[in-house]
Structures are given as structure tokens and as C-alpha cells.
Amino acid sequence: DNKELYVNLFTASTLDWTDTGLKLAQETNYPEEETSTISITAAPKSAVTFRIRIPAWSKGAKIEVNGKAIDGVTAGEYATVAGSWKVGDKIVVTIPLQLRTESTDDRKDIQTLFYGPTVLNALNPSTKFIQRGFYERNGLDGTIKLGVQKKEGTKNYFIIDGDEFEPAYNGDNTPYHMYFQRKDEYVGFAGKLTDVLNPKRPAAQDRSESTLMDDIWAGAPFKDRAAFIKKVQEVTKTYQDE
């Protein structure tokens, strides 16, 4: 209807929308950087509403129009940016890049490591699943923050427990693992494992098999340490009662 423009991908590009007169340029190095700037290079004949996709995995995404933040930026939805546009107007989208894991559909213990939208492969020649634990590395927002270092002089390369993780798009011939097996035998927080076993809750009709740590971190993000401790106490009591 020449009134709405959907932005689904953050990639360096230009648009010449002849029917409306709108021209724009998107400048970005995403996903190696977390911002994308959309600049109006020719004004449309009438108002155009931008619908900007905010990835479901994102935390803390924001959009600024000419330096002013807008409301209604929600993960997993399209943010609405409406207005009458002139040459030089800028929309800056910021999607913080954070480490996280995602499980396969059929097994929670088989996971992949992501940095923002980027799959990270572990460079390792083993012919068996490598095992890694990540819950003890989580920050309050549920993303991985502890016990991880970026490889010096690189972007999107990380070192974890001696293994180098690189973007899947790198595409060289080094043996790698795209999936790893989660190692979660013990409870761990704030970068440290304890000697307390991480109990499992068997699968039931209304849920898949899970562990104490699974159920605690299902409540992330936590607004503060008190909210996190409260969740730990609630979940622990549930396991004790069962």
C-alpha cells in the first residue's frame, strides 16, 4: 500500500522505492557490530511507517530516530517507527550481541553456542561430543558472561576452556563441532561450580525432562540479584516437595 516498509535484515544495502520517492541507505557491519544505521537519502512523497524486526533472542535492543529513543522495542516483534521523513533523517537500530546457547528440539543436552545471530563452531578434532557447561557462566540476564574471553585481534571469535569458537561463516577446513553436549552434573553460579548435584526432573505429559538449573534459568532475565535468589528458592522448594 506504499505506506509501510518492513526491515527484516540488517545488512549493508540501498533502497530506491520508486512508487513513493523514498530512497535510503543502510550502513552496518552487523553481525560483527551491533548497530545498523538507516539514512534517508531522498524523502518520500508522503508518510512512511517502518516496521523493524527485533530478533526474539535479543535483550536490550533499542531504536533511535535522529538521536531520540523510541518506545515499543520488544524482542520477537516488529518495532513501529512512523513519521514524515526528510533527507538526512537517521534511524539507528542497536541489537546487543551476546553469547547464548540453544538446544536441539529433541534433546536439551545437545546445544549450539551463538553470538547474537551467529552460530559459533568449536575448533576441536574429537570424534565425540565435546562437553561444556554454561549455566555457571550466566549473568542475571541469562546470557553467557563469565569464563569467556574474546580472541585478541578478532571479531566474533572466543576462547572457552581452551577451545576456540569461531563463526560458522568462516568456512575453513579446520575440524569443528557445531553442537556440544551440555555438562551439567553439578549446580554452579557466578562462574563457579559447587559440589551440589544438579537434580533431574523426569519428563511428564506436559513437559520434557529438565534439571534444577534448567528451571531456574527459564526465569531469566532477572532484574536484580534478589529476584534471582527468589527464583532459586522457589525452584529448589519445588524439587524438594516432589
Residues of each region from the PLM?
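Extracellular and analogous surface-interaction loops
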Residues: 38-46
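C-terminal beta-rich recognition modules with glycine/proline-rich loops and embedded aromatic residues
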Residues: 1-39, 74, 83, 94-186
